[in-house]
Regions:
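N-terminal Rossmann-like or analogous alpha/beta NTP/dinucleotide-binding catalytic cores
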Residues: 1-75, 194, 233-235, 239
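Divalent metal-coordination and catalytic microenvironments
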Residues: 7, 35, 91, 136, ...
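Alpha-helix initiation/capping motif
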Residues: 13, 39-40, 52, 62-64, ...
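A short, terminal or domain-edge coil/loop segment
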Residues: 32-45, 70-81, 169-187
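A short secondary-structure junction signal
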Residues: 46-47, 83-84, 111, 142
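Internal, conserved structured core segments that host functional sites
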Residues: 57-106, 110, 131
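Conserved nucleotide- and phosphate/pyrophosphate-binding catalytic cores
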Residues: 94, 100-239
Length: 239
């Protein structure tokens, strides 16, 4: 229910988009088993997304079969409905490529009935892979490092104020680093010029803010408070 509410809050119209519970469509499971005969273990092991997830979840020593084969299940979810375009983050591109391979092989072996989907990436590159608030991996419900669309204003504020920044930026006067700094990654993704007019008029744009941070004299707390204002404005219509 929560996921469906998120979908509709973001603008999906249930009169135009069908929202369903994946586990209740038994044909998807059946299609997954057919696809398993078209994919080798070696190919799954080469999938960059699978390799990254295995390392992140410490599955190297013992990989659950269900986890290992989830790219095949995703291929079923996509192809069963003849999807032509799939909105994804950058880390999911290998999944789309693997789906296209399955489609090509199925159509070659059996009949040309499946559609090869294309990936639709966000235009803003920073939105293609948002890290978790801990800065260690992408946002993931299982890792507990997410900002949820339904989070209250207080929850969002608490999470932003605990965000990973630059561990070497100990004093306000210290020069800060942008690379790997989660706060600036989120600003790259969500900040707009008008946000400076409303919440941080001392700066004309994000480039000026970054320049001040890297030369020193700008504290993490001030930047986080600005990000909180940006995120609250972004999420309020969804709430």
């Amino acid at each position: 229910i929560e996921v469906a509410l998120d979908y509709m809050s973001c603008g999906l119209d249930p009169s135009k988009a069908t929202i369903f519970i994946q586990s209740q469509i038994s044909e998807l499971c059946e299609l997954t088993f057919y696809y398993m005969d078209l994919v080798t273990v070696a190919r799954l092991q080469r999938n960059p997304t699978v390799k990254s997830e295995i390392q992140m979840r410490n599955f190297e020593a013992s990989i659950p079969v269900g986890f290992f084969t989830y790219p095949i299940s995703q291929a079923s979810d996509i192809t069963a409905f003849k999807a032509t375009t799939v909105p994804v983050g950058g880390d999911q591109l290998p999944m789309i490529e693997q789906t296209r391979e399955i489609v090509h092989k199925f159509n070659t072996v059996y009949a040309p009935v499946l559609v090869e989907p294309k990936a639709l990436l966000p235009e803003n590159e920073a939105c293609q892979r948002l890290p978790g608030i801990d800065g260690k991996a992408k946002m993931s419900k299982s890792l507990g490092n997410c900002i949820y669309l339904s989070d209250s204003a207080d929850d969002v504020r608490t999470k932003i104020m605990s965000m990973y920044t630059d561990p070497e930026h100990l004093l306000v006067s210290d020069p800060g680093h942008l690379e790997g700094n989660t706060v600036f990654t989120y600003l790259d993704a969500f900040c707009k010029p008008e946000h400076f007019e409303r919440y941080l008029p001392d700066y004309a744009n994000l480039d000026e803010l970054k320049a001040h941070y890297t030369r020193g004299g700008l504290g993490d707390v001030k930047v986080k408070k600005f990000l909180n204002n940006v995120m609250q404005e972004t999420l309020e219509p969804i709430r």
